[in-house]
Every structure is written in structure tokens, then in C-alpha cells.
Amino acid sequence: MNLPGPIHDFLLVFLGSGLILGGLGVVLLPNPIYSAFSLGFVLVCISLFYILLNSYFVAAAQLLIYVGAINVLIIFAVMFMNGSEYYKDFHLWTIGDGVTSVVCTGLFISLITTIPDMSWYGIIWTTKSNQILEQDLITNSQQIGVHLSTDFFLPFELVSIILLVALIGAIAVARQ
């Protein structure tokens, strides 16, 4: 979307705060159903970010795949599980929590040191800067691949780390 600067900045701040609040809801809400709905809200906010970046195909794929399929699957899985087992043997702090805290703190510190060095202005306006490269490409999927491997490399890696952590968490929950 080609919006004026102040409106674009307001929408970025609004969606960013929605992402932060939704992420906190995923982690802090005690009811898994509410956490799943909060995750759906986060995924919708991410797709709206893609719309602001003029990536309509990625936004549509985000909505269809993650919100429409994955989040609904999570909600069904949570609904079929026994709700009383979440509150049995509740320990406030375990060794795994300490290790997880150290790993997450390390990732957070590395991201805080990496993110200020990133040219975020260049990421937002890549559609204008890569016009010569895009003329040589034939399909939109090739353009998406080039952008993911050049301009959007850091956000793509952050998403892959988040998906890896989610996969490890799903395996840990499935073993219990």
C-alpha cells in the first residue's frame, strides 16, 4: 500500500503493538484455547504487515496457510485434549525452565545487537530499489525467492528460528 508517511508509521506502530500484546497473550494466558485465539490474532497482524509491504501474495498465503489451517488445527487439538491435565503437578520453576530462560535470553541479546545494524528502511522500500533485478525475472515466485535470500534474509531467519522452537515444543508436548 502506498500510504502517506504518518499513516504508514501509525499502522506500523499499531500492528507492532498488536503483535506484542498477542504474543504476550499466547505465552501468558492460562487457558490454551485463549492462547490459540491469541496466536490467530498474531498471525493476522503479521499478514497485515505483509500488506503494508506490498506483498499481497505472501499476505494471502499467510492468512490461508497459518490462520486458516494451522491455527484451526491447533484449536481442534487443544479442544480434544483433556483440560484437567494442564493443572496437575504444577511446579513454579524447573531445570528446563532455567535452561530455556538462558537460551531465550541469549537469542534476545544477539537479536538486540544485530537488529540496530540492519537497514530496515531498505527492507521496507525494496520494491522501489530492485526494479532492474525484477525486470529480468519471469514469475512472482522467483521474485519472492530473490527477496527472501537478499533483502528479507534476517526476517526470514528469525521466522525459521521461531518455527524451529515451535517444532521442538510440539515434540516435547507430544512426548508427555
From Swiss-Prot:
Localization (cell): Plastid, Chloroplast thylakoid membrane
Keyword set, alphabetical order: Chloroplast, Membrane, NAD, NADP, Plastid, Plastoquinone, Quinone, Thylakoid, Translocase, Transmembrane, Transmembrane helix, Transport
Membrane spanning stretches: 10-30, 33-53, 61-81, 92-112, 152-172
Keyword hit for NAD: yes
GO cellular component: chloroplast thylakoid membrane
Membrane topology label: Multi-pass membrane protein
MF terms in GO: NADH dehydrogenase (ubiquinone) activity; quinone binding
Main localization of the protein described in the UniProt heading: plastid
EC number: 7.1.1.-
Top EC class for this record: translocase
Catalytic activity, reaction form: a plastoquinone + NADH + (n+1) H(+)(in) = a plastoquinol + NAD(+) + n H(+)(out); a plastoquinone + NADPH + (n+1) H(+)(in) = a plastoquinol + NADP(+) + n H(+)(out)
Its job: NDH shuttles electrons from NAD(P)H:plastoquinone, via FMN and iron-sulfur (Fe-S) centers, to quinones in the photosynthetic chain and possibly in a chloroplast respiratory chain. The immediate electron acceptor for the enzyme in this species is believed to be plastoquinone. Couples the redox reaction to proton translocation, and thus conserves the redox energy in a proton gradient.
Assembly and binders: NDH is composed of at least 16 different subunits, 5 of which are encoded in the nucleus.
Protein family (similarity comment): Belongs to the complex I subunit 6 family.
PANTHER family: NAD(P)H-QUINONE OXIDOREDUCTASE SUBUNIT 6, CHLOROPLASTIC
Record's protein name: NAD(P)H-quinone oxidoreductase subunit 6, chloroplastic
Organism per entry: Coffea arabica
